Amino acid sequence: MMRVGAITLDGKATRDEIFVDLRERVARLAAAGRTPGLATVLVGDDPGSHAYVRGKHADCAKVGINSIRRDLPADISQAVLDETIDELNANPECTGYIVQLPLPKHLNENAALERIDPSKDADGLHPTNLGRLVLNEPAPLPCTPRGIVHLLRRFEVEIAGAHVAVLGRGVTVGRPLGLLLTRRSENATVTLCHTATRHLPEITREADIIVAAAGVPHMVTADMVRPGAAVVDVGVSRDDAGKLVGDVHPGVWDVAGHVSPNPGGVGPLTRAFLLTNVVERAEANL
C-alpha cells in the first residue's frame, strides 16, 4: 500500500542477474583448473554474524565458488587471529576472504583488517585498496557502494551530472561511495552529510539521488525528498519495539520516483559483489 508511487529498486532480482553471469564465469575458471575460493573468518557466537556468514557461503554454492570457513572462539588472542589471517594469505585455495565484523572488544579490528593481503581483500576495504580507489587505480571495490551504483544503473537512474546527497560518513558506505560517484565514469556531484551537517532537509530536497546510510530509523521523511528523486535505503537499525528498520520512512514511497526496499534492496548486491570481487581476482590470476 505504501509503494504505489515509486519504482522499486529491486536488489534481489538484480542479484539473481549477477549470479547468472558469475556462474558462467566460475564455470570457465573451473574448466581452466582455477576454481575461486572465498574464505570467512568468524570470531565468537554473535547470531547476526553467524547468519550473515552462512548466507555468504550459501551464495558461494549457488555460483560454484569454493567455501573456506575459519570459525574461532570468542576468547582467542590477537596472536591466534593474526595466525589465521596469515594462513589465509598464504593459502592458494583462498582467492579472497573477509574478517567478519564486529570482532570481540579485546581484539584490534583495524590491525586485523590491515593484516589481510590487499589482493585477497574481498570486501574492498583494506587501506591500500581504499587508497587505490582515491587514485582511480584498479583494486577490489567496496561491495556496498559498488552495489548502490550498479542498482541505480540497472534501473536507469541518471548518475552523470546528478546531485547525490549521501547521509552517513562510515568507512563501509558513505566515504567510499563518494569516491565512486565522483569518478569520471560516474560524474556525479556528491554532498556527504553527517551529524554536524546544517540544514539537512534543504540539502536533500535539492538532491536528485539520496543515499541514506546513517543507521537512524526513518530519518528520511517525505518532506525531505524532491518529487521524482531516487532514494536508496542502506541503513539498518532497530526501532523502539526492537524491529529492524531502515533509514527511509514509508511515506517516501509516495513522493520519490525510485526507492530501494530495505531489506531486499542494496543488501543482496553487497553479497553479490563480494563474490564478484573474488571472481575478478581469480580471472586476473589466469
Curated annotation (Swiss-Prot):
Transmembrane portions of the chain: none
Gene Ontology MF annotations: methenyltetrahydrofolate cyclohydrolase activity; methylenetetrahydrofolate dehydrogenase (NADP+) activity
EC number(s) recorded for this UniProt protein: 1.5.1.5, 3.5.4.9
Domain of life: Bacteria
One Pfam assignment: THF_DHG_CYH
Pathway: One-carbon metabolism; tetrahydrofolate interconversion
Keywords: Amino-acid biosynthesis, Histidine biosynthesis, Hydrolase, Methionine biosynthesis, Multifunctional enzyme, NADP, One-carbon metabolism, Oxidoreductase, Purine biosynthesis
GO biological process: L-histidine biosynthetic process; methionine biosynthetic process; purine nucleotide biosynthetic process; tetrahydrofolate interconversion
Catalytic reactions of this protein: (6R)-5,10-methylene-5,6,7,8-tetrahydrofolate + NADP(+) = (6R)-5,10-methenyltetrahydrofolate + NADPH; (6R)-5,10-methenyltetrahydrofolate + H2O = (6R)-10-formyltetrahydrofolate + H(+)
UniProt: NADP(+) binding residues: G168, R169, G170, T195, V236
Cellular component GO terms, alphabetical: cytosol
Assembly and interaction partners: Homodimer.
Function: Catalyzes the oxidation of 5,10-methylenetetrahydrofolate to 5,10-methenyltetrahydrofolate and then the hydrolysis of 5,10-methenyltetrahydrofolate to 10-formyltetrahydrofolate.
Family from the record: Belongs to the tetrahydrofolate dehydrogenase/cyclohydrolase family.
Protein known as: Bifunctional protein FolD
Name of the coding gene: folD
